[in-house]
């Protein structure tokens, strides 16, 4: 059988070399640029969104975990590049669940663009000008748009079906939580009442509740779910391995950490006096940390048995704040003799107060 030759010339593929690099057609460039965009998208996974996906994995059923694990890199690429494949396995089984692709594309009617590590990247739709809905793991949450604060009341209520008695009010009453809020307040230089904002009243019951700072939200989820706590631990290990500086920063932070003991009476008194005198606790100096500093007083708080240490610290810290009145608070004094303590305090101009 004879094969008839075609008079049509084959289409030529344009190619040029620039600085030793072969460059294809515009369409090829488009594909290449698309792949770069893909890499950029993948690199941004080291953000809040990755943790939320991890949380989603830990809270979903075994079948959902299996479905997610079956997605290869090529399948993820297809989902991002093809309009027809924007719906993930989870979406096909539940119309209310929204894929990662749609979350990143539909972040509110205002088309706001947030940093990669901004919690507001989980927004999927607006409720009104001030509030939006988002996806935190498998749960729908409400987010305050101006600052990214999340409705902690709703989050705890949603998860409480699985982890009973895990209400936000329980977390807020926890002594660990109070210490965390205190520390975050000092770190961010924000009043405590600005870290948790209460929204009540109004006709829209969907947006009522307590809205917490994103750092607090992570710890609230950590408190609710042991699985989430484990995932956070692995994320931290991956972060440490990413570069040597990260690991160095991590261990430097550990060296700065102070032991936490909720039964520590000194700590409890410190917080009570802070509220009473409107001062600042744990003021750092070259010689150590001052228990409490107010407009008028330099305060050290100690158990009766450690009164000598308190006097020594007050004398040292007064070098940095010579105009402050030195004040020593002693607790667990009970019926012990304090005459010697009074004499020494008088000699060094220290005001002695007994906490009972």
UniProtKB/Swiss-Prot annotation:
Cited InterPro entries: KilA/APSES_HTH (IPR018004), KilA_N (IPR017880)
Top-level taxonomic group: Viruses
Membrane-crossing residue ranges in chain numbering: none
Ranges where the record places region Disordered: 1-114
Domain KilA-N: 130-239
Positions of disulphide bridges: none
Compositionally biased tracts (Basic residues): 1-12
Composition bias, Low complexity: 14-46
A Pfam family reported for this protein in Swiss-Prot or TrEMBL: KilA-N
Acidic residues bias: start-end ranges: 66-114
Record-given protein name: Putative KilA-N domain-containing protein R878
Natural source organism: Acanthamoeba polyphaga mimivirus
